[in-house]
A protein has these predicted regions:
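Noncatalytic, typically N-terminal accessory segments of nucleic acid-processing enzymes
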Residues: 1-172
C-alpha cells in the first residue's frame, strides 16, 4: 500500500465532516486513527494471504525536491490570494521529518507492526519506489501481488515490472 494519498483522503474526510480542529497538534490523533481505519479497509478488501507492505513517502531524491518545494509554494501562494480555499490543515506537514509525520509513523507502526511491514517516512525514498524494491527483493513467481496507490508513477512502475507475473494495481 502506497499510503500518502490515504493521508490526504483522511484529512479531506475530517474536513468535510467538520472534525478537523484549528489547532494543528489536535489533528494528529484523529487523522492517524482514520488513516489506520482506511488502511485496514484496504487490507480487508484485498484480503492478502501473505505479506502486507505499508509505505509512506520518505525523503525524496534530490532531483524531486525542487518540484515538491515549488508545488508547496504555489499552494501557499494560491491560498494566500484566496484563489483556493484555505485549509484548516497545512499540507506541508505531510513532509518527512515534520512532527506530524513522525507522530503518524509511530502511530501506524504501533498499530500494524510486527504483523505487517511498515516503511515509514523516516526511511528515505518515495512510497511507490520502496514498494517495488520490496517486490524485486521478495517476489515469488507463483505469487499474486496487489499494489494500492493513486500516484501516476505507480502505473509506470507496474508496467516496468510486468515480468513479475500476477501483478495487479488496485485503484478506486
Amino acid at each position: 500500500l502506497d499510503c500518502n494519498s490515504i493521508i490526504y483522503d483522511s484529512i479531506r474526510e475530517l474536513h468535510k465532516s467538520n472534525l478537523l480542529k484549528p489547532a494543528v497538534a489536535d489533528n494528529y490523533e484523529p487523522i492517524s486513527a482514520l488513516l489506520c481505519t482506511k488502511i485496514q479497509q484496504y487490507i480487508d478488501a484485498i484480503r492478502p494471504s501473505n505479506n502486507v507492505y505499508i509505505a509512506f513517502d520518505g525523503v525524496a531524491p534530490f532531483a524531486k525536491m525542487n518540484q515538491q518545494k515549488s508545488r508547496r509554494y504555489r499552494s501557499a501562494f494560491l491560498e494566500h490570494h484566496n484563489v483556493i480555499p484555505k485549509s484548516t490543515f497545512n499540507s506541508a506537514l505531510i513532509t518527512p521529518g515534520t512532527d506530524f509525520m513522525n507522530y503518524l509513523s509511530k502511530y501506524v507502526t504501533a498499530r500494524f507492526s510486527p504483523k505487517f511491514i511498515v516503511s515509514a517516512s523516516d526511511i528515505p525514498g518515495e512510497g511507490e519506489h520502496k514498494l517495488f524494491q520490496h517486490i524485486r527483493d521478495n517476489h515469488l513467481p507463483d505469487q499474486n501481488t496487489v499494489i494500492y496507490g493513486l500516484d501516476a508513477d505507480l502505473l509506470m512502475l507496474s508496467i516496468f515490472h510486468s515480468d513479475k507475473t500476477n501483478l495487479f494495481v488496485y485503484r478506486e
